[in-house]
Amino acid sequence: MAEGEDMQTFTSIMDALVRISTSMKNMEKELLCPVCQEMYKQPLVLPCTHNVCQACAREVLGQQGYIGHGGDPSSEPTSPASTPSTRSPRLSRRTLPKPDRLDRLLKSGFGTYPGRKRGALHPQTILFPCPACQGDVELGERGLSGLFRNLTLERVVERYRQSVSVGGAILCQLCKPPPLEATKGCTECRATFCNECFKLFHPWGTQKAQHEPTLPTLSFRPKGLMCPDHKEEVTHYCKTCQRLVCQLCRVRRTHSGHKITPVLSAYQALKDKLTKSLAYILGNQDTVQTQICELEETIRHTEVSGQQAKEEVSQLVRGLGAVLEEKRASLLQAIEECQQERLSRLSAQIHEHQSLLDGSGLVGYAQEVLKETDQPCFVQAAKQLHNRIARATEALQTFRPAASSSFRHCQLDVGREMKLLTELSFLRVPEAPVIDTQRTFAYDQIFLCWRLPPHSPPAWHYTVEFRRTDVPAQPGPTRWQRREEVRGTSALLENPDTGSVYVLRVRGCNKAGYGEYSEDVHLHTPPAPVLHFFLDGRWGASRERLAISKDQRAVRSIPGLPLLLAAERLLTGCHLSVDVVLGDVAVTQGRSYWACAVDPASYLVKVGVGLESKLQESFQGAPDVISPRYDPDSGHDSGAEDAAVEALPPFAFLTIGMGKILLGSGASSNAGLTGRDGPTASCTVPLPPRLGICLDYERGRVSFLDAVSFRGLLECPLDCSGPVCPAFCFIGGGAVQLQEPVGTKPERKVTIGGFAKLD
């Protein structure tokens, strides 16, 4: 039983040692210089926050052609970037060497930097190629002497060396052989001592007795960081430059306006941040291990996917080779057939010519026929023979080979195919689509249209994402609604919320994966449900002057002789003909919205709404011509001035003329066909591509909007005591086009009065 407990204890100890060893080996990677791949020796902090050994940095600068900026390795340090030399055992303390004369000569102008003329106005900027981030770091004109030593990293390296060293005791440097183990160190003397030697070399009552002993070490560092410019202890930290500064640096013009804080505050802030970050990492070790397992699984999948990709590419290339081989066989077969046909024709021609030789073939037969003396028999045989001889004679006189020996028509032009094969590469994901803002709009539904850039790889399908931007943001990442696998380059989003702002984006997908998202496009939905209706020209419309389209969604006023004949006085021009077109649907409750486009060349068009009864009464029984100052029952009789409460107007129109919107000083100027109180101060605004009309039946208000930006143009009161329907008035030439609904067209609503009530 005791043996089992001992074995368990031994196993736990060994496991702990293995974990410690693994931890130390993993930490060793952080303590290696990126240049020499050995543990840091006197590391310097580069402006990019990476570290490098001073000797390695000096060597790199020498390779770059910078001379006199690395400092003398044997010199005593005059700045934190310089490093003291380690004194050999049993040697007296060396005197301080002189500062680096070469660096002073270069600064004073007696020396020159490589590539810099003597007496140049601007000092040379030294670039150091950082081996960690692979970028050039500016060191300034001071070179390495302007950098700080990373004393903390030195201490970590020293502690690591002591923890992994076996029997690596530090010996006294002043003892006679054999030296004893060192117990103290002295930064001022830069040596390690045993107890006896420390007392011997630091006698009581002398200045050396004031030296503060430290732990024994082989690497002596300055007590603190010193400013490389003023040789003063750094006491502040410049947040703007992200650099430690001394009291003199703090008041210099270089740091004027910078955020400077005491080094204690910077120390505490950075320590708190580092502690919190480290605590978070240590508290989420399970998450780290889970992510490591996920990465390992990703590596396995990568290996499998890579092998599958290789096999797929090999199979496709073999398929191309098979197609090429098949094509090669068919082309060679065609050449072979052409060759055999030509050889056959040439062989037949040779046979014909051989028959023309003396004593053979046709010539020999003709010679024998000429020997015939019986005239009838000769004529019988010579007739056919003569024809053959004539053809042979003609062929002899116009000799030409029966077939050409050239096969130029069998040459292949493989330039295009070679270019395609040369450009054969892996399929790329589609580029970010471009939203077609001219064709994208929001009406009863949202219609989104896009296209791919000219040289983009093809997309098999698209993903459309959308969300509302006018709702409170939920905690966490932004949530998008998606429409997956959209075919084509357009999409419909049904039933959007009214009076909202939607942001939409789209991206393509093919076998290579998903591409980048398009730029976001923001669309405003109508402020109320869209009203679907058709144009009805039976009330107040002249068929001679108004032309309504077959789908009853467009109307055009045609000026001409009928318009002139409709006026009672042709010469004065004080009377004009007004033609009215109404919608076939009336509104009795709720809010409704519709949009239309007015031809900018229209002379005078009024777009709006009115009470159904008042519109029929006014225009069905009104004279054919009216004065521009005539108000067809605006709802105000001659006694309206004495009424306590002014009645609401039965009509509300927006006036458009010659590409401009005519706005009066108030809503009353557009409440009817004309102003009630005569001319008023008015202004004009440009006509937008589409006009929107929003009717609030309960509130008795109608708003005219820019249907593209939904910017308000005019808001008017309206008498909503009965059914209200859309109305369009024309004076002179003009045209109006109702906006087509994005969805399926609704069925026509037909009632006995020509109007359907929308309840």
Swiss-Prot record:
Domain COS: start-end pairs = 370-427
> GO terms for CC?
axon cytoplasm; axon initial segment; main axon; microtubule cytoskeleton; proximal neuron projection
Q: Which residues form a coiled coil?
A: 322-400
Segments forming domain Fibronectin type-III = 429-528
Report the residue ranges that make up the B30.2/SPRY domain in this protein. Answer: 526-747
* ZnF region ranges: B box-type: 222-263
Q: Which domain of life is it from?
A: Eukaryota
A GO BP term, please?
Answer: regulation of protein localization
What does the UniProt function comment say about this protein? Microtubule-associated protein that is involved in the formation of parallel microtubule bundles linked by cross-bridges in the proximal axon. Required for the uniform orientation and maintenance of the parallel microtubule fascicles, which are important for efficient cargo delivery and trafficking in axons. Thereby also required for proper axon formation, the establishment of neuronal polarity and proper neuronal migration.
The name this protein goes by in its record: Tripartite motif-containing protein 46
